[in-house]
Amino acid sequence: MAYTPNRVGNCLALQSMGNPSWPSEDELNEIKTIVSEMSKRSKEDVRIVVSPYRICPLGAHIDHQGGNVSAMAINKGVLLGFVPSGDVQVILRSAQFKGDVNFRVDEKLYPNHCSNKKEGTNANGHAKLQEDNNWGRYARGAVYALQKKEHCLSQGIIGYIRGSDGLDSSGLSSSAAVGLAYLLALENANNLTISPTENIEYDRLIENGYLGLKNGILDQSAILLSSYGCLLHMNCKTKDFKLIRPLYMESSLKSETQKEYQILLAFSGLKQALTSNPGYNHRVAECQEAAKILLNASGNSHVEPHLCNVEQEAYEAHKSQLETNLAKRAEHYFSENTRVLQGLEAWASGRLEDFGKLIAASGRSSIVNYECGAEPLIQLYEILLRAPGVCGARFSGAGFRGCCLAFVDANYAAEAVEFVRKEYMKVQPELAAQMNPETAVLICEQGDCAHII
């Protein structure tokens, strides 16, 4: 994979001065204390995996079709404190879920697909983390992935995992952050040297192989490859990626009129997808069916049915053969892929307002063409577009639960937060009342990639 390791602060027009603000020393010390008590080891022996959540400004729903995507880590996520267990035992506790998880890394693990009644998926195609006191399956999935790649594990871990309060099931890829945290901890405990690109595939083994889901590699890539202050671009067909920063920062020049933007997250209060939605896997199947028809029509029936394998010219020539739903899915893919490429240019040149307009268009296409989004999320998206200082918004995830993201002028951030909070209360009073008003709308910063402290 192509990789440009630009790891510099404030490399874009977001407020990104200094180092990431998360995790704090207090958070780290608290987790070290808990793991020390669990393991009867010194706090100095405790290691902590920092695995951030992510946002994807452009590239909605096209990673599984091999499209281009963009992403960045944020300063919220999962912290996993651990020590090597000294034997093959894994002992885990969670701040969010009840009950200890205990198993052995030398157990032979087999796929735990969602046909199992204890499993379920959310609208993003990820497994639900909390059902039936089965929250430890991502840890088992990490062992499964390492076993499948023929790594011999002799060390388990004693660990304590905590996600940022209120952000699980929020459309920020908490499940991918959890899976990667376990992978990094187990690899560290067993002295395994695994590259980020390998771990992208390992985490996909957790979700695709162990849990039987059909999601792509966007979330894992964003968490593992992001760099503080930069925008990650990934081609999901070739797996090539690069980190992008505006040209004016390359030359250490900044226009006096250049606005600074922050990331705004607005939560819907929906923790579970509505039962009437068609589901992530169904949308993936529709995209593949559209690709199959277009490839057959263009004489390429032997090619794997993904929309990335359909040339733009072939799509334009044969799209009339697609029935209405499939035509909409294909239109979303090709228009979104174009928006990503245009967005990369806007970002690189520091045109954040143009970048924001493309994000808003992405959100609209997700609703109209990809036909995803529960009513509360659609309302939240529309409120954000009216909020002071917001230059672009869309769902963070599939739009059936969780939150919406937006880029907001830093000078208007506080005003935008208050506007969104009040307007959402008007249209969804019951959902709004269920949330803590202090965390229902958040201002975030960029974060760094997953790493171990």
Predicted regions mapped to residue ranges:
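Phosphate-handling active-site elements
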Residues: K149-I158, L186-Y202, D409-E423, V427-L431
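C-terminal nucleotide
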Residues: M1-L58, G66, L79-R137, A145-Q147, ...
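Glycine- and acidic-rich phosphate- and metal-coordinating loops
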Residues: E119-G125, V143-Y144, K148-L167
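Beta-strand segments within the central parallel beta-sheet cores of soluble alpha/beta enzyme folds
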Residues: R93, Q155-G163, I194-L205, G356-L358, ...
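Alpha/beta catalytic cores of group-transfer enzymes, especially the acyltransferase/condensing modules
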Residues: T193-I244, A393-S396, I443
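DPxDG-like acidic metal-binding loop motif
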Residues: A73-K76, L172-L192, L405-V408
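Gly/Ser-rich catalytic serine loop of serine hydrolases
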Residues: E131, S164-A177
